[in-house]
Amino acid sequence: QKTLYSIADEGVVSFRILENGALQKLNTQNIRGMRGCHLAIDQFDQYLMVSGYHDGKATLLALNPDGSVGPIVDGVFDKGIGSVAERTFRPHVSCARMTDDQKYILVADLGIDQVRVFRFDKADGRMRQIDTIRCELKSAPRHFRFSPDRKFLYLMYEVKNVIDVFRFTEGKKPNDINLEKIQ
């Protein structure tokens, strides 16, 4: 079954896409925050990440087997002060994505010029921050993607107008990761 997720004033709305292309509303789920700006689904269709530009919040929700949106699993607010007073004087989460193995969630914040890295524990559903990529001031990290083999992270910026490439490696310990900028 195909499912469409949309941001709405009240949170997130899920729709089943019917064979004729029509949409059938499944449900609406509140995110306990301001309207999001970006949605991402994990590889196994188990989780939905909502990026909150206006309130600096990344919200993780469960997805039900029928495609409807389940309850909030966890959520984190970014804190800090940005580098451009006219626009980025506070956190603005622009992208949140889970790695394909569901171990990590990365959260890009163009307001404070950072990408925060969280370890995701499926057992208790918690996101625990383990690292931060501190980007160049006034660069505004906007979106990112991993390479299919997850060896590289491609980070795109809104203001800087470049793509940085990071080598992603894991150590032997659960929270031992390294994101080395190589380009």
Model regions and ranges:
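Short loop/turn segments immediately following beta-strands, especially the blade-tip
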Residues: 15-21, 60-70, 119-126, 166-176
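Blade-edge beta-strand/turn elements of extracellular beta-propeller
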Residues: 23-28, 69-72, 78-82, 123-136, ...
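Residue-level detector of Asp-centered blade-edge/turn motifs that repeat once per structural unit
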Residues: 1, 43-45, 100-101, 148-150
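Asp-box/WD-like beta-propeller blade repeats and closely related beta-sheet repeat scaffolds
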Residues: 24-95
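Short loop/turn segments immediately following the C-termini of beta-strands
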Residues: 9, 53, 63, 110-111, ...
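Structural signal for beta-propeller blades
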Residues: 12-14, 56-60, 113-115, 161-163
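Acidic, glycine-rich loop-and-beta core segments that form the ion-binding/anion-interacting portion
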Residues: 130-183
